[in-house]
Amino acid sequence: MATLSRMPDERFPRFNRLWTVVALVTVLGLVVGIRIRLLDVPLERDEGEYAYVGQLMLEGVSPYEHVYTMKWPGTHGAYAVIMAVFGQTAAGIHMGLTVITLATALMVFVLARRLAGDFAGVIAAGSYALFSISPSTLGLAAHATHFVVLPALAGILLLQNLDERISALRVFIAGLLLGLAALMKQSGAAFGLFAACWVVWVEIRRPEKHWRRLLLRLGCLALGGLMPLIATCAVLAAFGVFDRFWLWTFHYARAYASIMTLKEGMQLFFQVSEDVFKSAPALWCLSLAGLLLLFCERAMRPWLVFVLGFAGFSFLAICPGLYFRAHYFLLLLPTAALLAGVAASAGLALLARSKFRLNPALLVVLLFCGAGLQMLLKSRDIFFTLSPTRVCMAIHDVNPFPESV
């Protein structure tokens, strides 16, 4: 894999490190503060399902024994772990979600840092943290899509710098993580497909192609990816509920995914996309700018296929069934954050070459902070004023989630 040239933020290492770290710590601290303030928001519908099944699992009851769902049981298991650690309450579940989103922000930082340097990493991580609390994507709730993103990014990170030294074991572990992402929710399998395509692309771009190594890596990736599902099927079979699992998560899920027409799906997509964009227009514009600058910045060209492929398969992950629920868009947030980091780094390069009088890093950080502030102010009542119960009512309208507690 070609090594990227150093990005221009290295021209002011001390100054940039100070301002970028301050900005990142401020944003992450603010986001954590908001999540902690809202720990007691009543569980919504999907959270209630995951929590109930997770609670049954802690009591030794298998999924699909008393509760039927078309979702694979990964997120239910994650809830069981969270409740075992933080308690079987809404606050405990949301504290676990806070840890998950912070870990994901760290993954986004590493991913963007490899692409375009430290500056891009901190802007991308800060962008993800802000995106992840958006009411428009139901980011304050512990949806399965949050749990898909973390292992998916971890697996992709293991494969990002794929060269001759990468062992088959590392590829297998990446497959395990990507398989775990799919176990959290079936649509997470799209990230496994991206990983397979990336492995193929890296190999066929080499001057000397090693087909045996390519087949070995694809085999290890596929084996690792299937292991979580195989293990799950074995456990469910041991509990005597495999037939129910197969009925609900394959037969019923397939029928459910075929209900929506293409026209209806496109209408939903544009409707939800508009709501998501309007919730943080400045941050989304920063991401769109990153998509454009991706083609302009020479240092980014070795990663062009990676970023575009990641974006394309992230979009594919929200498409199954064409339902385009608001929380499906959580799967797009790592891509959006990554592109925001690209925009910041590429913008810094352009400003540095133009001999801009103001410090380029300071200007870009101020622009990012302004974009984040705009998003926070747009939903300020939810983030800073309303009680947890009122927040639930504001986001979910007439759904009686508070009353069901």
Where would I find each of the regions flagged by the language model?
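Perimembrane helix-loop-helix junctions
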Residues: 6, 10, 191-226, 291-299, ...
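Short hydrophobic alpha-helices at membrane interfaces in multi-pass membrane enzymes
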Residues: 161-179, 209-220, 302-312
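Membrane-interface alpha helices of multi-pass inner-membrane proteins
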Residues: 170-186, 191-196, 227, 311-319
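Membrane-interface transmembrane helices that cradle and orient dolichyl/undecaprenyl
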Residues: 155-173, 200-207, 282-303, 344
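Transmembrane-helix signature of polytopic, membrane-embedded enzymes
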Residues: 19, 108-131, 149-150, 168-170, ...
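Membrane-proximal, lumen/periplasm-facing interface regions of secretory-pathway glyco-
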Residues: 41-42, 356-405
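Transmembrane-lumen/periplasm boundary regions of multi-pass, lipid-linked membrane glycan transferases
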Residues: 50, 180, 207, 214-300, ...
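Hydrophobic/aromatic-rich transmembrane helices and adjacent perimembrane loops
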Residues: 190, 315-316, 322-363
